[in-house]
Amino acid sequence: LKCVNLQANGIKMTQECAKEDNKCLTLRSLKKTLKFCASDRICKTMKIMSLPGEKITCCEGNMCNA
């Protein structure tokens, strides 16, 4: 997965997804929102050591939307 959008501490960086990777996965925590590009359409659940289980959802379009 390729990080497309990182929003933390008021800093926001956005980048377009490639045409073949236009499905986005969203990982949200209390202070930040991570956006990933994914070529598949399957939504998965990710668990990180320092965070509780986070729900990841897919969004359509060539840009990752909040």
From Swiss-Prot:
Taxonomic placement: Eukaryota, Metazoa, Chordata, Craniata, Vertebrata
Taxonomy, superkingdom: Eukaryota
SS bond list: 3-24, 17-37, 43-58, 59-64
Function according to Swiss-Prot or TrEMBL: Lacks alpha-neurotoxic activity, has apparently no antibacterial activity, nor anti-coagulant potency.
Location(s) in or outside the cell: Secreted
The UniProt record lists the keyword Secreted: yes
InterPro entries tied to this protein: Snake_toxin-like_sf (IPR045860)
SUPFAM superfamilies for this protein: Snake toxin-like
Record-linked Gene3D superfamilies: CD59 (2.10.60.10)
Name the record gives this protein: Xenoxin-2
Organism: Xenopus laevis
Gene Ontology biological process terms in this record: defense response
First-listed, main subcellular location of the protein, grouped into a coarse class: secreted
Gene Ontology CC: one annotated term: extracellular region
Keyword Hydrolase: no
Tissue expression from the record: Expressed by the skin dorsal glands.
Keywords annotated in UniProt: Amphibian defense peptide, Disulfide bond, Secreted
